[in-house]
Amino acid sequence: MFEVLPLFKSHYSIGKSILTLGSAGSSEETGPDSIIDICSAAKLDHFYLVDDSMTGFMEAYHNASDAGIDLRFGLRLSICNDISLKEKNSNLFEYKCILFCKNKAGYERLLQISSFASTEGFYYNPRIDYK
C-alpha cells in the first residue's frame, strides 16, 4: 500500500516556503506556521525536511527531537556535468537531486558536499558534479 510522505521545505529555502522550523507551540494565528506544530497536530512520528542549504538543519533537529518527532533531512543539490565550466550556458544543463542522510556520518558527509558545492562549484548557485 502507498504511504504519504510528510515532506516539507522551510523558510531557509528563501522565497519557497512560509513554514518555519520554530519549536512546538511557536506558531501564531496570524503568522507563519511551524513545521513542528503541523507534525505534532497531525500526530506524525517523523517528517522529511528538504532544503537547498544546511542552514536550518540544527534548528530543525533540536526542535523535532524536543517534540519527540524523528527528522529525516535531505539536501537538494544542483548537479552539472563539470563544475569547472563557468560559462554563459554551462548552467543550462543542470538537474536537481536530493540526498538524504540517515545518521551522523551521513550528516557530516552532507556538510562536506554542501561546503564543496558552495565554494568550488558555485556558479549562480551551489553545484556539484560526479567527479
Residue ranges and their predicted role:
Residues M1-K131:
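Phosphodiester-processing cores and adjacent nucleic acid-binding clamps
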